[in-house]
Amino acid sequence: RSSDLNDEFREYLSEFARSDEYKEMLVQHTVHMICNSGGNVGIERISQELVYSPRYVERVFKEYTGFSPKKMCRLVRAHKALLMLLCSKEFSKTMISLECGYADLSHMNRELKSVLGVTPKMVGREDLYLGSMKTSQTVYNF
């Protein structure tokens, strides 16, 4: 009798794990982990916590969002760096780059340009909001 219950429970869990509801929860948890880490979490860590293979997590995430967890990490980290550059006059650009998880200032500069289309030199300039930041709106359309 208990083996029948175990079999039924396993079947239920197996079906639930394939359901859209479960996949949505997986994506929400992945987004939560990425945002809470400031974009500094790898797919290995995410998949360990979710107890699924990195490939499965990437596939489900991309199916629901249209891009990879790594791309979201890059977006979140670049956005954090941009906000710190805009709001924090007490830290140097090098300090901000390290705080955001970049290897160095040039790494942050390349990522900001690649991901958001801006450079640290552009931050604070009026045309940042009139031109370049318009392109970042399409990036956050998820």
Which residues are covered by each model-predicted region?
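Basic, amphipathic alpha-helical hairpins
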Residues: L13-S19, V31-G42, L83-F91
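Short, Lys/Arg-enriched anionic-surface-contact patches
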Residues: L13-L26, H32, S68-V76
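Basic/polar phosphate-binding segments, predominantly the helix-turn-helix DNA-binding elements
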Residues: E44-M72, S97-T119
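…primarily DNA-binding HTH/wHTH and HhH modules…
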Residues: L86, E111-F142
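Basic, Lys/Arg-enriched C-terminal extension of HTH/homeodomain DNA-binding domains
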Residues: A78-K80, I96
